[in-house]
C-alpha cells in the first residue's frame, strides 16, 4: 500500500481515538448538538479504524513469518502462514480502498421521492401508484417514515404525480439510484383483447437539505399562486385558497402543495421541495460536467435514463444499467428492493474505484 495512503489511514485512526475520548468528556455530553455530531463522526470512522488495525496486525504477521523462513525447522509452516497473511492483507487493502472513497455528503439525509406518470395515460397513473406502494413497503421494512407532501390522483386510480418525504437513516444513499425512467409491460384491466401495453413513469429522488444549506432563492424570482385544494371524489375539499403553487422563474421549476389545510404549512413544504429540486438540478449539471472527462456508468440521476422494465406477464424485472434480470417481480412490487439496489450500489463503488485508479 502506498505510504501516502498509510499516512492518511494513520491520521483517521488517531482521529477515531481522539473522538472516542471526547465523547467521554462531561462538557461535550452536556452540549447535545456537539455530542450528536461527534457520535456521527465516531460511527463513520469506526469501520476504517477497525480495518486499519487489522491490516497493521497482518503486516506484523507477515514480518514474523518472513523471519521464520530462515529457520529450516519452521520454514514449511512459515511459508503457509506467509501465504495466508498476504492473502488477508490484499483483502484488507481492498476494503480500505472502498472505505477511503469520498462519501456523498447527502447519503445520510432524508429524501424527497417524486413519482410521475409518463406515457400511457390511465395505465401510467396506475403504475405510478404501484411504484409508490413499492417504495412505501420498502421504507416500512427499513423503519423509515413516509410523509406525503403533495399528490395529484389519476382519474381511475393511482397518481398523475405524488411527492413524499422519506425520513430515516441513510435514506438518500439507498434510494438515489432509483432516479430515472421506470417502464411497465402488462395487460390493463380495461384491455379486452389481452394485448400487452407499455407505460412509463419517472422517479426522482432528492436529498432534503438543512435550511442553512438550501440554495439562495431570491423572492423576486418566485411566482406564488394560491388555489383551492381538490379532494378525492369531491370529499374534504377546502373552501379556502390553502393550496400553493410556486414557480421558480429562472429555472421554470414548479412545485405544488395542497396536502395541508394551512396555506402557511403548504408554502413551507413547497419551498423545501423547491430548494431540493434546485439543488438536484445544480448537482446533476456539475456531475454531467465531471462525467464528460471520464466514463460514468451510474450516478447521473438523469431522469431520461431507462432504469428498469417491469414485465408482468413474464414476472420479470430488468435493470438495464447493469444488465440484471430477475424473475421475482411479485417480491419486487412488495418492496423487497435490496436485491435490485445492492448490485447498483456495488457497481457504483467499482466505478468510483476505477476512476480513482485512473487519477493515480
From Swiss-Prot:
Belongs to the prokaryotic/mitochondrial release factor family. Gene3D superfamilies: 3.30.160.20, 3.30.70.1660, 6.10.140.1950. GO terms for cellular component: cytoplasm. It is found in: Cytoplasm. InterPro entries: PCRF, Pep_chain_release_fac_I, Pep_chain_release_fac_I_sf, Prokaryotic/Mito_RF, RF-1. This is Peptide chain release factor 1. Methylated by PrmC. Methylation increases the termination efficiency of RF1. Its main location: cytoplasm. Residues 284-313 are annotated as: Disordered. The gene is prfA. Peptide chain release factor 1 directs the termination of translation in response to the peptide chain termination codons UAG and UAA. Pfam families: PCRF (PF03462), RF-1 (PF00472). One of its GO terms (molecular function) is translation release factor activity, codon specific. The modification N5-methylglutamine is found at residue 235. Keywords: Cytoplasm, Methylation, Protein biosynthesis.
Amino acid at each position: 500500500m502506498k505510504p501516502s495512503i498509510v499516512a492518511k489511514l494513520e491520521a483517521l485512526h488517531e482521529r477515531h481515538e481522539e473522538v472516542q475520548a471526547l465523547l467521554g468528556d462531561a462538557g461535550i455530553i452536556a452540549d447535545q448538538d456537539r455530542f450528536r455530531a461527534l457520535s456521527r463522526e465516531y460511527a463513520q470512522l469506526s469501520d476504517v479504524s477497525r480495518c486499519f488495525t487489522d491490516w497493521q496486525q497482518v503486516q506484523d504477521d507477515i514480518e514474523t513469518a518472513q523471519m521464520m523462513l530462515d529457520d529450516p525447522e519452521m520454514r514449511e509452516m512459515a511459508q503457509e502462514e506467509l501465504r495466508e497473511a498476504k492473502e488477508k492483507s490484499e483483502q484488507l487493502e481492498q476494503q480500505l480502498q472502498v472505505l477511503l472513497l469520498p462519501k456523498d455528503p447527502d447519503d445520510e439525509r432524508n429524501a424527497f421521492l417524486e413519482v410521475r406518470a409518463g406515457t400511457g395515460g390511465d395505465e401510467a397513473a396506475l403504475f405510478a401508484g404501484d411504484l409508490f406502494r413499492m417504495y412505501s413497503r420498502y421504507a416500512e421494512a427499513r423503519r423509515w417514515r413516509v410523509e406525503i407532501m403533495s399528490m395529484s390522483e389519476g382519474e381511475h386510480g393511482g397518481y398523475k404525480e405524488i411527492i413524499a418525504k422519506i425520513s430515516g437513516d441513510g435514506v438518500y444513499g439507498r434510494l438515489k439510484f432509483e432516479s430515472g425512467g421506470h417502464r411497465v409491460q402488462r395487460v390493463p384491466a380495461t384491455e379486452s383483447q389481452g394485448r400487452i401495453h407499455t407505460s412509463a413513469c419517472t422517479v426522482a429522488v432528492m436529498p432534503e437539505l438543512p435550511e442553512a444549506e438550501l440554495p439562495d432563492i431570491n423572492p423576486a424570482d418566485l411566482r406564488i399562486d394560491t388555489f383551492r385544494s381538490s379532494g378525492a371524489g369531491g370529499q374534504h375539499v377546502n373552501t379556502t385558497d390553502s393550496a400553493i403553487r410556486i414557480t421558480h422563474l429562472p429555472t421554470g421549476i414548479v412545485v405544488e402543495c395542497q396536502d395541508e389545510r394551512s396555506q402557511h404549512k403548504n408554502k413551507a413544504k413547497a419551498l423545501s421541495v423547491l430548494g431540493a429540486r434546485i439543488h438536484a438540478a445544480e448537482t446533476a449539471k456539475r456531475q454531467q460536467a465531471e462525467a464528460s472527462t471520464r466514463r460514468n456508468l451510474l450516478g447521473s440521476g438523469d431522469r431520461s435514463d431507462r432504469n428498469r422494465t417491469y414485465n408482468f406477464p413474464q414476472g420479470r424485472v430488468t435493470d438495464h444499467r447493469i444488465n440484471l434480470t430477475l424473475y421475482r417481480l411479485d417480491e419486487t412490487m412488495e418492496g423487497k428492493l435490496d436485491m435490485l439496489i445492492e448490485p447498483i450500489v456495488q457497481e457504483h463503488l467499482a466505478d468510483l474505484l476505477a476512476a480513482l485508479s485512473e487519477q493515480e
